[in-house]
Each structure stands twice: as structure tokens, then as C-alpha cells.
Amino acid sequence: MKRKIIVGSRRSKLALTQSNWVINKLKENYPEFDFEIKEIVTKGDRILDVTLSKVGGKGLFVSEVEQALSDEAIDFAVHSMKDVPSSLKEGLIIGAIPKRESPLDCFVFNQVNSLDELPQGSVIGTSSLRRAAQLLKHRPDFVIKPIRGNIDTRLQKLHAENFDAIILAKAGLARMGWLENTTLKLEDIPPEVCLPAVGQGALAIECRESDQQIRDMLTSIHHEETGICVEAERVFLKKLNGGCEIPIAGFATRANEFVQFKGLVGNADGSIILESEQVGANPSEIGNKVAEDLLSEGADTIIKELRNV
């Protein structure tokens, strides 16, 4: 009799699309298993009338899923890596990180077709302090207005609430199949304008450390280069004790065995943005070094002030 593998997922269309993508990849290698998705509602899904930075805490989109893993109600979980706290619940590990989608943020415009065409005082929809701070540094005239909900909800609000543009993760649009043959007015935001969130574009497949069968299975869809880059980013995040209440960004690439990593911390209005970039062979060392650079420049003061607001 086939073992049935229970996969934990949030119930948004994007989360279910991501979970089904992982399942289909695993079925290619393990056709002898059956897979079933268990939908789980998280705190972040329930609280939609408050920005995430004001809700506070870590793991807003993963805590309930991790609890189901610990309780053995599910066998593994599929998360967006950028939602996963830098420290996992005891007994749980990241079993695999598949190949990364685009890490970039992108504009979805209401009327115009590019950032340069947005008029003075344009209203931009984002609830991300990271995106808001970097965008305000680039265009202090912008008015940032919070927007919550899943991708389809936010796309509806673009027109219904008269935003000039909203910002979404390009990876989500790609996974939903909305980049091809789309009527959406899209433009990638280069990292020089808006450095991505730690882990953005990557998936995290979390499992119990003690479940060797699942761990062996997940190894088949792990992408080494993505895993190395994400390691540098998450070490950086952990060193700074970052969360969604801090404008913090980090993005690593790898070429010729070397990791290039850039990290950033800023204040809420983008008037202070601290940046550092390092290159090296060891992703953990590089992530730590960039964090230490920013701390020496005063990142700890910014973080303390934001947490006391």
C-alpha cells in the first residue's frame, strides 16, 4: 500500500500553486507515493486590516504550519522562503530549496507603463517597509499607502482603490502564470532601486529533522546554488534579528564558486539607508560580514528605534 504524504500549505491560490508544483516535481521521482494537501490558515492570513509591521512578531505566515509539522499532522510544508523566520521551531529543518524564481520586485501600473512615467505624488501600494523605504529614497514625492491581501486581491485593489501602482514579487506572478499573455502593465524594479527581501523568489520545504524518509525524498528537488545563496541571506537576517517591522533587504548571487552578497537596512521613510556588499567563497561568513558592516554603521540604532515605535 502506498504511503500517503500530507503536505501543509496556506490556502491562498499562490500557496496552493506552489505546493502543487512541489508535489508534481516529487511525483516525477517518487511515483510510488500519493500526495495530499492539507490547507492551514495562519495568523497572517486572518489579520488583513493591519499592516504586517504593526502586527509584529515573526512567522506570521508559518507558525501554524510549523505546529502542524511538530504535531505530525503533516509530513512537510511548502513556504515562500521570505516568510520563514531565520530561526526554525525546534525539531524542524529546511529539507530542500528548489531552484529560485526571479527574486525581483515589480511594479504593476494602473495607467502608465514605467517608473519614470509616474507623476509627482503618485500613490504606491505596498505594506512592505523594505519596499517603501527604498522607493522613498529613490522618489521622496511618492505617497505610500498600505495594501494587504493575496495577489488577486491586491490586483483588484489597484483599480478599485485608485493606486497609481502597486508592488508585487515577480516570482508570485510567474508561478501563477501571469507574466505570459498578460494585460497587466508590469516593470521589473532593479536591485539598485529596490533590493529584494531575504529569500525572495525561493521556496522553503520544511520537514521534521527526525523523518529521514521525507528528508531523502526532498533532497531530489534541492537546488544547490539557490541553497548557497539563500544561506548567506538568512545568516545575515539572523545576525540582525530582522523581521517585517524592519526595512531590511539582502540578496546573494553566485558565480565561479564565489558568493556576492549585498545587504541593506534603512529607516521607515528611506532618509537613512545603510548598505554593504561582500564577495567570498563561504556563504555563512559573507552573510555575517555584511551584517557586521551594517551594525558598525549604526544599523542596531535604527532597528532599536523602529522596534520602540
From Swiss-Prot:
Q: Which GO terms describe its cellular component?
A: cytoplasm
- Top-level lineage group: Bacteria
Q: Which GO terms describe its biological process?
A: heme biosynthetic process; protoporphyrinogen IX biosynthetic process
What reaction does this enzyme carry out catalytically? Answer: 4 porphobilinogen + H2O = hydroxymethylbilane + 4 NH4(+)
What's noted on cofactor binding?
Answer: Binds 1 dipyrromethane group covalently.
InterPro entries cross-referenced by the UniProt entry? HemC (IPR000860), Porphobilin_deaminase_cofac_BS (IPR022419), Porphobilin_deaminase_N (IPR022417), Porphobilinogen_deaminase_C (IPR022418), Porphobilinogen_deaminase_C_sf (IPR036803)
Q: Does the keyword Transferase apply?
A: yes
Q: What class of enzyme is it?
A: transferase
Q: Known EC number(s)?
A: 2.5.1.61
Give the cofactors, semicolon-separated: dipyrromethane
Asked if the keyword Transferase belongs to this entry, the reply reads: yes
Q: What does this protein do?
A: Tetrapolymerization of the monopyrrole PBG into the hydroxymethylbilane pre-uroporphyrinogen in several discrete steps.
The miscellaneous remark of the record is: The porphobilinogen subunits are added to the dipyrromethane group.
Q: Supply the NCBIfam families for this chain.
A: hemC
Q: What is this protein called?
A: Porphobilinogen deaminase
Source organism lineage?
Bacteria, Bacillati, Bacillota, Bacilli, Bacillales
